[in-house]
Amino acid sequence: MDEEYIIRIANGLFDEAYMAKRYLLTMEQMRSCTAKYRDEMSHSFAFYNDAYSAMVYATTMALARYYDDDSDSIGWKKLYNDFANYVNRMPSNDTYRIEIKLCDVYLFSENKEFYDRLQDEKEKCVWNNFQTCGIMMEMKPKECLYYYKKKKKPLNKHLSNLSKQRNKAFAHNDGVLCFDYEGIDSAFPLDLDAMTALTDYALEFSRFVIAYITGTVKMIPGKNDNDLENTLLLVKNAMESSEIPQQKVRAH
């Protein structure tokens, strides 16, 4: 596989994950503001409800496309395999610094050499930072591939539910659960934490592939914490200011 083709796939999949992350951050804002600005949001309840539902749908579909592993699909599986072949054909002695969370160290226990290195770094990290950070590991390209393959393993349950939801509700209507969206969501749950984990991994892996081949590190979405709250604060101020004259009139 040539570099341009792999980069094209990686960029396309990165864009899918990027939009999914944007949707998730917006949903996070909406959930956060619901308790604080319930009265203000109630004036546009239908809008917020429809917008939230649409973003759940869009996020599910974006992730389903990213992780689609059908033989003819261009998704994570194809990108991983094509990139692995590229690394094997173009060996490099370069190393890459990747952060591994302390809670994920156990995933690599079957590889003794790699695991022992992790344990050594873990002891330094715990001693120096009291477990407040991850382990920064210097890895060769093939070790990076091993890392990303193992890191994906805990996501398999979420991926199974994502696939079931896509096949039974979003791509077409399953004959058994036809239009029973609540039943599908209950049988194959995929909450915001699960979608966030899938999205963060998707961004990280695609970003690594692009950086490895091109040397360019793509930016990932940051939290726009105040976007929605700023608007709702204006609504709140307008509501409060419009109530003042009415209260004075009633007082007289």
What function would you assign to each model-found segment?
Residues K152-F179:
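Histidine-centered, metal-coordinating catalytic motifs and their short helical/loop contexts
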Residues M1-H158, I184-H252:
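Amphipathic alpha-helical interface segments
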